[in-house]
Amino acid sequence: MPTCWILNESVSFVVALLWLAINIYLFIDTFCWYAEEESFFYTRVILGSALAWARASAVCLNFNCMLILLPVSRNFVSLVRGTSVCCRGPWRRQLDKNLKFHKLVAYGIAVNSVIHIVAHLFNLERYHLGQAKDAEGLLAALSKLGNAPNESYLNPVRTLYTGTTTQLLMTVSGITGLVISLALILIMTSSTEFIRQSSYELFWYTHHIFIFLFISLAIHGGGRIIRGQTPESLRLHNVTFCRDHFDEWQEAASCPVPQFSGKEPSAWKWTLGPVVLYACEIIIRFWRSHQEVVITKVVSHPSAVLELHMKKRDFKMAPGQYIFIQCPSISPLEWHPFTLTSAPQEDFFSVHIRASGDWTEALLKAFGAEGQAPSELCSMPRLAVDGPFGGSLADVFHYPVSVCIATGIGVTPFASLLKSVWYKCCESQSLPGLSKVYFYWICRDAAAFEWFADLLLSLETQMSEQGKAHLLSYHIYLTGWDEYQAIHIALHWDESLDVITGLKQKTFYGRPNWNEEFKQIAYNHPSSSIGVFFCGPKAMSKTLQKMCRLYSSSDPRGVHFYYNKENF
């Protein structure tokens, strides 16, 4: 089992461990520095350990904000992924988990934000207490600094009557801190699985609040509320000696009044690079959005599925890639990902879109999928296309044996792959490295098989004619049927062709027994590297991951299953 786990999860584990180690190092190093640094001794007299907690979490926040944009810069990720010299094997698969890393970094931002906010609430209260009438000793002396001419202050709360809320709303750091906190709350709460599934538009729009978050983060330190003793003051004012003689600061030449200043803002130094990279991403997206997209064909399929054929100048794709589509007449800001269902050999590119939210429902309606189709293609709404981008499914041809598994509309990326196989068979081209493809499709609605069955029938016929019938083994599972369909299936069971798909391979009813399927595949290919590719729900993904671990051999010469899941 350890060897099997290493095959699929080792790189992810190393990346997560490295990220965690850097966070821990930055936190501890910064915490110790602020807890011991002489220039912040007087600051610690007022604030105590909350100073170190606030500053340590701030550095970790800067680090994670530096990382958060990189995984979602899809042109950058696609560029790195396409550079095979720099990105091979498990590292290539790690790039396909970019959204998981994005979420991991987001959790880091959330945790450090809570620490930072709580620590600064303590700091504000300690500053306020420093101005209390019963404050005495060194605390009182430090809080009163700044009242006399040529004195710099240490305590930003200048009077006892300045409340915590007032202080927050009177400073740059306070206002930007509130903006950052509110932005994080909105982004985090709208990123839950429930919101993304039920209202993708809400998730999309709230995520763009990050613009205000990064602007506020860049100027957050401009208030310079946390102040330390200046280097010049430290040379003249010996803290070790003078802290016990604060009553003599005004008179004694050996203990002049300490001078303080705030540190320069540093968050922008951490985030400038990724922000510039993401700005380039937006510019590329804007440029692509203004390139003409010609819609050549529109097909309305059963089960509320819309098929669009399009053309775009200099558009080049590979099997298994995906694009982002924008429809300005529906929303000028929203971009939605869809896998390509066409093959590189075709003179167009296509997508199949299922109605599963407000935006997709509006798109189907705009293209007449509900029965009111525009009579002319020129009357169709304008679309903008960004991409294509590489995903995990593009690696199907990199394994000698590939297992492709889809549920429902998740079959769309495999349409491109199987079409590409079909074209290669038609042209009598070889498939270098690929000797066997197992295809599984699990669907609850028999009507959904309509558009895909034609492709499988063509592939089945062509492979038989080319003597390559052994290359593809497909298994279609129907999980939902009514009484009428059951009777119809029973009456035609003995026919040579399947009653639902029209294929020679009969449709299975129910769900696959994955233990038996993986056991048989492992038996058929005892010493092979097998790529398992999945597009579908999270629950089944966990099951398939488990199967890959269970049936991978601990012997380096045995069978090994490598799991790949499509993520947008």
UniProtKB/Swiss-Prot annotation:
EC numbers for this chain: 1.6.3.-
Uppermost EC category: oxidoreductase
Localization in the cell: Cell membrane
Membrane spanning stretches: 13-33, 50-70, 104-124, 168-188, 202-222, 396-416
Membrane-side (Cytoplasmic) residue stretches: 1-12, 71-103, 189-201, 417-568
Gene Ontology MF term list: heme binding; metal ion binding; oxidoreductase activity; superoxide-generating NAD(P)H oxidase activity; superoxide-generating NADPH oxidase activity
Cofactor: heme
Disulfide bonds: none
Summary of the tissues where the protein is detected: Expressed in the inner ear by the spiral glanglia and the organ of Corti.
GO biological process, one term: detection of gravity
Gene3D superfamilies linked to this entry: Nucleotide-binding domain of ferredoxin-NADP reductase (FNR) module (3.40.50.80), Translation factors (2.40.30.10)
Notes on activation and inhibition: Activated by the ototoxic drug cisplatin. Activated by NOXO1. Cooperatively activated by NCF1 and NCF2 or NOXA1 in a phorbol 12-myristate 13-acetate (PMA)-dependent manner. Inhibited by diphenyleneiodonium chloride.
Subunit details: Forms a heterodimer with CYBA/p22phox which is essential for its activity and cell membrane localization.
Function of the molecule: NADPH oxidase that catalyzes the generation of superoxide from molecular oxygen utilizing NADPH as an electron donor, upon formation of a complex with CYBA/p22phox. Plays a role in the biogenesis of otoconia/otolith, which are crystalline structures of the inner ear involved in the perception of gravity.
UniProt name for this protein: NADPH oxidase 3
Organism encoding this protein: Rattus norvegicus
